[in-house]
Amino acid sequence: MYPDNHYKSLVEKKLKDLNLTSTRTFKYSSNPEVLTGEIEKLTNYSQRKKNLELRKKMFEDKEDEQSLKQLERLEQLYTLGGVNFDSVIIIDFGNSLKSVLTSLAYTDVNQEKVLITTVNQWFDESIFYENTIKNLYYPSINYKEFK
C-alpha cells in the first residue's frame, strides 16, 4: 500500500525492480475522507457487514439456548468474514500512515490474522501512543545510539 502522492513514481519503480510475485499493490488517496472509502473497498467491508446482518437475522426469531448464545456472540462483532489478504506493507509515514491504520481498524481488519508492517516508522515516536493498531511491525535501529 502506498499513497497517491509525488513519491508514487519512485515507489512504483522500486516495487517493479523487486520483481515480487504473489503480491498486489494498492495505491490510496492522501485525503482521509476518500481514504476510508478506498480501504472499505479493499477489505470488502460492505459485504462483510451484510454477512453479519444476515447471520444475525438467522438467529433473531429463535428461542433455543444455542441460538441465543450465537446471536449474543454475533452482537459483539462489526463484520463477519475475513479479508482476502494475510499481510500489508504500508509505505507511508506521519499522519497519513495514522489515517491508513485507523481505516484498517475501522474496517475491522483482524490484527491477529493480518500482519501489518510499515517501512518508515522508527523515527516517529507518536505512533507508539496510537491505540488503533496493536500489532504494527516496522524496521528499527538502536534509537539511543542514533540520537
Question: How would you name each of these model-derived features?
Answer:
Residues I89-I91:
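Structural motif
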